[in-house]
C-alpha cells in the first residue's frame, strides 16, 4: 500500500503534504484553538479537513486557503462543511491578510498544519499583518517551534526568534510524533500559539532596519558583532548602547536588537576611524 495515499488523495511532495490522522492530537489542537461562533477563523492548508471538520462544526462560517486544486475542490463539495466555507484556492504567501480582515470586519484567528517546506517564509509573511491578526495556532516542525521560542545564548536562537518575539508572544502548546501523520514525516512536529502584542514591548521606529540588522548579524553568527555589524556600528556606539562588541549574534536580546535598530534609524551608520 502506498503510504502517501490518505482518504484517496496522493500526498504531493512539492506541496510538502503530510496529513494529520491522530484523533487525540486533532482534539488537543482544536481544544487549544478554542474556536467560537462569530470569530474570523482562517485555516491555511486545510488538506483533507482533519482540523477543518472539528473546527467547522463549532462555526457558522470558516475561511480556508488551499493551494492544491484537487483538495480545494473536495472542500467545495464537502457534505456539511461546503456551505460554511469561503475557499481561496491560492498560495498563502500571496494572501493579503489585512484586506481579508477588513472584508470580514474583525481581526483574524489563523490556524493550520503548515507545509514544512514553506513554514518559515510564511511566518515572516504573516508577521507583516499582525495588526490584522488576533492570534495564530500552527503545527510546525518541532525544530522551527524551538527556534520561535528560543532565548539568547542558545543554538536555536536566531533571526526567526528575534522577529517572532518582536511581533508576538510565543507559546508552545504540544508536541506531535511522526506517527500522527500520513505519510509520517521524518521529523517531530509541535503546535505553537502566537499572539501579536497589543502594545509592543520594544517599539521599533523602522522594522526594515531591525530586519537588516538581524539578517547581517545571524548570517555571520560565529563572528563578534564588532565584525558582523561593523559596517553599521562603531565599537564606541555599541559601548554607548551598553552592548559588548565582543558578543555574538546569539548573545544579543530582542530588546537590544530593537535598541540598535532605533539608534540606526536616528543616526547615519558610523564606523570607527
UniProtKB/Swiss-Prot annotation:
Q: What class of enzyme is it?
A: transferase
Which reactions are catalysed by this chain?
A: adenosine(1518)/adenosine(1519) in 16S rRNA + 4 S-adenosyl-L-methionine = N(6)-dimethyladenosine(1518)/N(6)-dimethyladenosine(1519) in 16S rRNA + 4 S-adenosyl-L-homocysteine + 4 H(+)
Q: Which residues bind S-adenosyl-L-methionine?
A: 18, 20, 45, 66, 91, 113
Which GO molecular function, any one, fits this protein according to its record?
RNA binding
Q: Name one Pfam family in it.
A: RrnaAD
* Principal subcellular localization: cytoplasm
InterPro entries on file? KsgA/Erm, rRNA_Ade_diMease-like_C, rRNA_Ade_Mease_Trfase_CS, rRNA_Ade_methylase_Trfase_N, rRNA_adenine_dimethylase, SAM-dependent_MTases_sf
- Subcellular location, in the record's words? Cytoplasm
Q: Which UniProt keyword terms apply here?
A: Cytoplasm, Methyltransferase, RNA-binding, rRNA processing, S-adenosyl-L-methionine, Transferase
| PROSITE patterns linked to this entry | RRNA_A_DIMETH, SAM_RNA_A_N6_MT
- Its EC number is 2.1.1.182
Domain of life, source organism: Bacteria
Task: Report the GO terms under cellular component.
Answer: cytosol
Q: What does this protein do?
A: Specifically dimethylates two adjacent adenosines (A1518 and A1519) in the loop of a conserved hairpin near the 3'-end of 16S rRNA in the 30S particle. May play a critical role in biogenesis of 30S subunits.
Q: Which family does it belong to?
A: Belongs to the class I-like SAM-binding methyltransferase superfamily. rRNA adenine N(6)-methyltransferase family. RsmA subfamily.
What NCBIfam families does the record tag this protein with?
Answer: ksgA
The family database entries (PANTHER family) matched by this protein are listed as:
DIMETHYLADENOSINE TRANSFERASE, DIMETHYLADENOSINE TRANSFERASE-RELATED
Return the protein name.
Answer: Ribosomal RNA small subunit methyltransferase A
Q: Which organism is it from?
A: Citrobacter koseri (strain ATCC BAA-895 / CDC 4225-83 / SGSC4696)
Top-level taxonomy: Bacteria, Pseudomonadati, Pseudomonadota, Gammaproteobacteria, Enterobacterales
Q: What gene is it encoded by?
A: rsmA
Amino acid at each position: 500500500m502506498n503510504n502517501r495515499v490518505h482518504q484517496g488523495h496522493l500526498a504531493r511532495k512539492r506541496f510538502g503534504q503530510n496529513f494529520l490522522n491522530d484523533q487525540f492530537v486533532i482534539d488537543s489542537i482544536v481544544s487549544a484553538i478554542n474556536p467560537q461562533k462569530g470569530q474570523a477563523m482562517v485555516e491555511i492548508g486545510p488538506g483533507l479537513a482533519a482540523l477543518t471538520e472539528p473546527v467547522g462544526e463549532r462555526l457558522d462560517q470558516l475561511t480556508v486557503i488551499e493551494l492544491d486544486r484537487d483538495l480545494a475542490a473536495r472542500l467545495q463539495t464537502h457534505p456539511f462543511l461546503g456551505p460554511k466555507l469561503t475557499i481561496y484556492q491560492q498560495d498563502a504567501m500571496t494572501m493579503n491578510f489585512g484586506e481579508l480582515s477588513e472584508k470580514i470586519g474583525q481581526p483574524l484567528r489563523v490556524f493550520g498544519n503548515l507545509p514544512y517546506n514553506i513554514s518559515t517564509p510564511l511566518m515572516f509573511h504573516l508577521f507583516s499583518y499582525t495588526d490584522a491578526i488576533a492570534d495564530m495556532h500552527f503545527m510546525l516542525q518541532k525544530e522551527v517551534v524551538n527556534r520561535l521560542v528560543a532565548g539568547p545564548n542558545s543554538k536555536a536562537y536566531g533571526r526567526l526568534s528575534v522577529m517572532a518575539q518582536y511581533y508576538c508572544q510565543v507559546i508552545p502548546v504540544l508536541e506531535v510524533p511522526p506517527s500522527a501523520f500520513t505519510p509520517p514525516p521524518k521529523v517531530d512536529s509541535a503546535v505553537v500559539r502566537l499572539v501579536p502584542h497589543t502594545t509592543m514591548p520594544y517599539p521599533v521606529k523602522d522594522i526594515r532596519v531591525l530586519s537588516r540588522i538581524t539578517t547581517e548579524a545571524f548570517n555571520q553568527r560565529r563572528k563578534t558583532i564588532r565584525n558582523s555589524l561593523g559596517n553599521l556600528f562603531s565599537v564606541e556606539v555599541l559601548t554607548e548602547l551598553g552592548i559588548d562588541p565582543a558578543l555574538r549574534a546569539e548573545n544579543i536580546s530582542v530588546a537590544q536588537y530593537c535598541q540598535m535598530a532605533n539608534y540606526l534609524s536616528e543616526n547615519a551608520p558610523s564606523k570607527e576611524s
